[in-house]
Curated annotation (Swiss-Prot):
Transmembrane segments: none annotated. There are at least six actin genes in Podocoryne carnea. It comes from Podocoryna carnea. This is Actin-1/2. InterPro entries: Actin, Actin/actin-like_CS, Actin_CS, ATPase_NBD.
Length: 376
């Protein structure tokens, strides 16, 4: 199938960030926001080379005059035209490759609608003329990256979180739980609680500022009630943040109230279990004989697991749910923001994987539905 001298491309299209690079590399070459921006004002200066749309970092840097849209929501592509722009940008501007010369590995969230991966497959073969492609489940790749074959992965990105138990390399589909609560919801919640403090953030561009505040200052409290008392009685937890216009805002309990929603989704008006309960429920759906191995190999992955304090809090919460003698280990690799991509890089460069690719020929014979037969 693929010649050995042609490196496969690995593209992890997240709801928030797109990570792209070459199989065999230890980190993605390109990481940029999964954003397409369109001007919201009339261009008046001729010869400025104004475009009708901007992608990624360029959209981010011109955000003040653009309306920003994320074509991927909750891990599902909602706007295929914009998605095509992002892929085009990935291949031609970021990686500078001809997509028709390289096999491409894409990633997706589990329990996604079937039509989503069929359309991905169709665009890769028909628009970009890929010689071969494959769609892998994000959490499975994170486990590859951690060097394990057994464990439960809590993968939480910008659009979707999911827990996937894997035993000896087999994913257990009946025990996968998907939670549509992730980083973007926390950004929205942060916008809301900052409004209560008298700071107003409304536009799509201002949301990006709030996302930055969240990423730089938020953390997970080990004991939420205790932390709330500390915040109320002293200013030790307050931090200041400088907005792009030089104005300085101060945030206090918002720093840990925001990610607390991961453990208490009721904060967002969501009627679902928190990430700790979801992980526990996922383990409980597995056979009693393998639970011990899952408790001892709970792997965190994705950008929304980057909050300081999250691993200790997970350890505490799961310990109180699990049987008292159970050994619980939360693994939080420092590079977990990119572990899905890293796992993809490992997978696509394995010699045993080379017969797994869907080739252009197979696609021409069977159509887009081949993706369900050949990809887990």
């Amino acid at each position: 199938m693929a010649d050995d001298d042609v490196a496969a491309l690995v593209v992890d299209n997240g709801s928030g960030m797109c990570k792209a690079g070459f199989a065999g590399d230890d980190a993605p070459r390109a990481v940029f926001p999964s954003i397409v921006g369109r001007p919201r004002h009339q261009g008046v200066m001729v010869g400025m080379g104004q475009k009708d749309s901007y992608v990624g970092d360029e959209a981010q840097s011109k955000r003040g005059i653009l309306t920003l849209k994320y074509p991927i929501e909750h891990g599902i592509v909602t706007n295929w035209d914009d998605m095509e722009k992002i892929w085009h940008h990935t291949f031609y501007n970021e990686l500078r490759v001809a997509p028709e010369e390289h096999p491409v590995l894409l990633t997706e969230a589990p329990l996604n609608p079937k039509a989503n991966r069929e359309k991905m497959t169709q665009i890769m073969f028909e628009t970009f003329n890929s010689p071969a492609m494959y769609v892998a489940i994000q959490a499975v790749l994170s486990l590859y990256a951690s060097g394990r074959t057994t464990g439960i992965v809590l993968d939480s990105g910008d659009g979707v979180s999911h827990t996937v138990p894997i035993y000896e390399g087999y994913a257990l589909p009946h025990a996968i739980i998907r939670l549509d609560l992730a980083g973007r919801d926390l950004t929205d919640y942060m916008m809301k609680i900052l409004t209560e403090r008298g700071y107003s953030f409304t536009t799509t561009a201002e949301r990006e500022i709030v996302r930055d505040i969240k990423e730089k200052l938020a953390y997970v409290a080990l004991d939420f009630e205790q932390e709330m008392q500390t915040a109320a009685s002293s200013s030790s937890l307050e931090k200041s943040y400088e907005l792009p216009d030089g104005q300085v805002i101060t945030i206090g309990n918002e720093r840990f109230r925001d990610p607390e929603a991961l453990f208490q989704p009721a904060f967002l008006g969501m009627e679902s279990a928190g990430i700790h309960e979801t992980t526990y429920n996922s383990i409980m759906k597995c056979d009693v004989d393998i639970r011990k191995d899952l408790y001892a190999n709970t792997v965190l992955s994705g950008g929304t697991t980057m909050f300081p304090g999250i691993a200790d809090r997970m350890q505490k919460e799961i310990s109180s749910l699990a049987p008292p003698t159970m050994k619980i280990k939360i693994i939080a690799p420092p590079e977990r923001k990119y572990s899905v991509w890293i796992g993809g890089s490992i997978l696509a460069s394995l010699s045993t994987f080379q017969q797994m690719w869907i080739s252009k020929q197979e696609y021409d014979e069977s159509g887009p539905s081949i993706v369900h037969r050949k990809c887990f």
